[in-house]
């Protein structure tokens, strides 16, 4: 016996999950499982096909495209199709343009490699990420050093969004407000660590000893 199951996911509410299911799955594909499979295959072929490698070594090609898939799969959408999302203060917010979805992304040292890959082959996703980061800053007044579930975790001592936003800008991705981004990032870099009222930490963890000594002495911070 064949059993078909469809599910919708929302970080906002049940109505959002139903709407996401309707617009992203039920309306375009109905109960046709093969249509879903073929669409997923088509989408991924388009992304993976943006880089063409030449080699007679099948295993090398398999390794390359498998890891390219893993690198691109790291991003996730945190807003609903109607543009609603839950911000750092657990408030339901509404994007002016639902297409400017709130995108989660790994910050920790990925500006060296993964983010540059996005800038080169999927600039539209880098653009969404930058606009998302700026939107969240405008909501809470702070950029996030390493978000988890759109929260100010404070687990990262550095300010990697600077490198990621600047990297996107230098790659020609400029459909976001750099002036707003600059003001927010400057504020973050010049503020000692403090608790955020909605939970978590904002500011630069080791700013105080660095401003006093010009470096971070052993025992004065988590790193030296």
Language-model regions, residue ranges each:
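Aromatic-rich carbohydrate-recognition surfaces in CAZymes
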Residues: 103-224
